[in-house]
């Protein structure tokens, strides 16, 4: 019996990839033209180099900090020969305010969640990222008050597909793993992670086409509703 539905957040409940790219472009323009009066290409190159350095340094430990934009912008400024103490938080806040003003929840998602809640099904979030910004996204997307629990990789100390994250969210929800439908866009992190944890995975195809015929998949929330209605 299905007692809970757990969602990945980024690119499952809203478009993260494309809005992130736009926010990066806007932030680079802001830094280049308003703060440092440098060429935009130079600033973008420094940002990309700084981001890659952070990921290279931290990804081996599978830490949420590898996603932290304050570190990306710190490295960017250091590469440009500018003191991060002067501008880092200003740039960080500019980026996230720009990003949050762009995002909107996928059509049908709130209605789907409300319907599941009305049927007594608990709703959780299991997401790689730092907790602070995920709470801000949840508020922006209108999910506050609709969720029963969330686990971030920052809280878990490890990232998906490690089973610890999946076990922690079910513990918070008070359900067993085999009582959960898990919805996420990453085949490796979400689909296989949930499957290996004993959940029923649904691959949310926001960024790619289906390649595994043995996996339930949905391209939108109308399709997800049809799948869930058959499973429960």
Put a short name on every predicted segment.
Residues 1-49:
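Active-site neighborhood of HAD-like aspartate-dependent phosphohydrolases
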Residues 1-5, 17-18, 33, 41, ...:
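Asp-based, Mg2+/Mn2+-dependent phosphohydrolase catalytic module
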Residues 22-26, 67-71, 132, 164:
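A generic alpha-helix surface/boundary motif
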Residues 33-46, 79-92, 146:
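Short, surface-exposed acidic
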Residues 49-93:
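A metal-dependent, Asp-based hydrolase signature
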Residues 95-102:
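Surface-exposed cleft-lining segments at the edges of enzyme active sites
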Residues 121-123:
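Short beta-strand/loop segments at the ligand-binding rim of alpha/beta enzyme cores
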């Amino acid at each position: 019996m299905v007692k809970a539905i757990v969602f990945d957040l980024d690119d499952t409940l809203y478009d993260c990839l494309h809005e992130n790219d736009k926010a990066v472009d806007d932030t680079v323009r802001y830094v280049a033209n308003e703060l440092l009066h440098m060429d935009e290409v130079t600033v973008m190159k420094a940002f990309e180099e700084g981001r890659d350095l952070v990921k290279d340094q931290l990804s081996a430990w599978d830490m949420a900090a590898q996603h932290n934009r304050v570190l990306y912008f710190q490295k960017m400024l250091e590469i440009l020969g500018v003191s991060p103490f002067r501008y880092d938080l200003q740039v960080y806040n500019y980026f996230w305010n720009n990003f949050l003003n762009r995002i909107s929840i996928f059509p049908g998602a709130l209605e789907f969640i409300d319907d599941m809640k009305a049927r007594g099904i608990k709703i959780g979030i299991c997401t790689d990222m730092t907790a602070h910004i995920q709470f801000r996204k949840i508020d922006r997307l209108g999910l506050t008050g609709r969720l029963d629990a969330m686990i971030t990789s920052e809280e878990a100390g490890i990232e998906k597909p490690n089973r610890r994250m999946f076990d922690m969210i079910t513990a918070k929800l008070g359900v067993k793993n085999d009582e959960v439908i898990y919805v996420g866009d990453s085949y490796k992190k979400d689909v296989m992670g949930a499957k290996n944890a004993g959940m029923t995975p649904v691959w949310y195809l926001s960024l790619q086409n289906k390649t595994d015929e043995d996996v339930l998949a949905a391209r939108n929330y109308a399709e997800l509703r049809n799948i869930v209605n058959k499973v429960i």
